[in-house]
Amino acid sequence: TPRRQGRVTLNPLAHLDPLGTILIIFMAFSGYGIGWGKPVPVNPGYFRSPRRDWVMCAFWGPLSNIILAVIFAIPLRVMLASGERLPDSVFVDFILSMVLANIGLAIFNMIPLHPLDGSKVLSGALPDIYDRRYWNFQMVYGPIILFGSILILPLIGLPNPLRFILLPAREFLVDLLLGI
């Protein structure tokens, strides 16, 4: 459990995944920002309805990002409601960065490729026969498709197909939150 692993803390060091941390540092120099933290351990033995509860558990991460984006968007929305342009300031830049980052994380994590949360949400929505096939496929090919799309394709000069999903969805949600 997270408590046994010393992860019930606000200390970010407790949540760093060694490979994810090294990769984000390395990738920052290449212009890509990809990395990850340790996944939150989940004990399905506590689930009353395992299939439904896996979906709910997977959905909470992206939902928490949306909630944070809404909270950070409130001051920007208030400023925009005054009819004035947003001032150029570190505060506004920080708040806008938090809105963009949290919306981006929510959308990215809902992509239905393993190990992202969207794979668990889709898996729970599928009938049992398709769920097993989907899950078997995702366990093997999900990470390959995901990392190939993010890392390999751009390195060989091809566009990342996930951008065609992520950027329009992020733009739509930012416009919705900020009332633009």
Per-region residue spans from a language model:
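Hydrophobic transmembrane alpha-helices and their immediate loop junctions
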Residues: 1-180
